[in-house]
Amino acid sequence: IERGKIMTEIDMKGNPFFLDEEGENWVLDTWKNMSLEQKCGQVFCPMGFNGEEETLKHFTQDIQVGGLMYRADSAENIQDIYRKLQAFSNIPLLLAANTEAGGDGLAYEGTSFGKPMAVAATDDPENGYRMGYTACKEGAALGLNWSFAPIVDINYDFHNPITNVRTFGSDPKKVLDF
């Protein structure tokens, strides 16, 4: 793809974007009018650590990040932070969280289903669906639009502290089912 043509080569009307003509034009016009510095800022998704307006404005107006990830806090605080972030940003942000065990990955009040391995131990894939559905509904209610879940890693090395109980197990079929 020639330099400068990458945005026109992407099918924004198809999967995963499904934009109408107005949405596609907004993306193309926005991209065309962004400086190189602004485009670089869009690739960053730092960890948010507080809701102070000065910090939120720094992320959205100075750095012009593409997204932010927050750890669990009260639902009221998360919703307030997400609303401010979107209001301060010229481009809609990706707002991320680890909701791998349920909505409590974003808000203390969220539903906890336990770690994925515990859910898989029920041998009922419907529980995996319930966990994901609930996490998505609860996250979306607060403004979340990017969930780092479900975990589809396979636990081939039970000594690995990164995957371990955060997976649905060591059987690829079971992981797929859940």
Predicted regions, residues:
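Preference for extracellular/luminal or secreted protein segments
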Residues: 1-62
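Enzymes and membrane/adaptor proteins characterized by extended Gly/Ser/Thr/Asp/Glu-rich
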Residues: 49-52, 56-178
